[in-house]
Amino acid sequence: MVRVKFTAFLVCLLALSCTPKDRYVVFSGYAQGGTYSVKFNMNGRDGMISQDLQEIKDSVDAILTAIDASLSGYNKNSILSRFNAGETVVPDSYFIDIYRSAYDVYNSTGAVVDAASAPLFDVWGFGFKSGEMPSSDKVMEVMSGCGMNRLQADVTMAVSGDGTLNPYDLLRDRNGVPPQLNYNAIAQGYSCDKVARYLYSIGVKDMMVDIGEIFCDGVNPKGMPWGIGIDKPVDGNNDMGAQLQAIFKVPAGPHGVVTSGNYRKFYVKDGRKYAHTIDPRNGYPVSHNLLSATIVAPDALIADAYATYCMVIGLEESVSFIESTPGVEGCLVYDDGGEFKTWTSQGMTLSEL
């Protein structure tokens, strides 16, 4: 699913530490077309973290740079961009790893979150290429070349002995249209998880990683759960945190937190609003009263995927999905006769503003 990523606004500011030994630090930088920030406690699982702050920041920057070089659809020299252009590429560990995750997400969401629908996103103007208002015939034509079900489940089976991957070799039917992939629905969540995994590896236990999506664990500097604000889904609300719908505390333990919505990327044609959330099952932008979906899940990639999933299937199905999925909590903001209303799952406590 192509969509704009909404940073769940960090409400809790770094303040006094929990204990005399705690030392919370923060650094930020640029990645994946935007900014990122990492906040964590230098007092880790086994005492003070041995690496200095600059070394940690350099390692995080290296991870994000490597992911961008592999998976960015906007970087024309990335492995993904060259693959989508029909070139034979040498897939790295990130390319292989996220492909496997995307295939799992495709299956778990019943083909709703489909990384192999990149041409469909492009034709509507919400992908890596410009486009606007395709004809129904064009939509059907483009859909015939989409779908993870056309591709092998294990990308490594398509990699040649010399380590290269030809796009045609990924097809189940090699005579089909070569695939094009778009990981916008999971890439930033995936990046959060990768950075968090690195922080765990050096002993960090209390952290907040924000790369347009959020991963957090442990507690904030006050010894309390991390506080997250949910933006009010007002068209054109691009100033994150300026207009909040509600605030909630993230449950204890490691969690990804992702908000998806249709209020920051859309266009209007002949008086009708076309949102950037596309349903790959029919090829058209969704039209329903669900304005935003905030998902809390065990990791950021899954939260990312499920937030997109909810924005496709709408309010009623999203409620059923969240209530029936173990380890997942959610907050849905919807339009009820011109008023913003919220629904929250049982394990998610909100303070509405």
Task: Pin down the residues of each PLM region.
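Mature catalytic core of soluble alpha/beta enzymes
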Residues: 2-7, 17-353
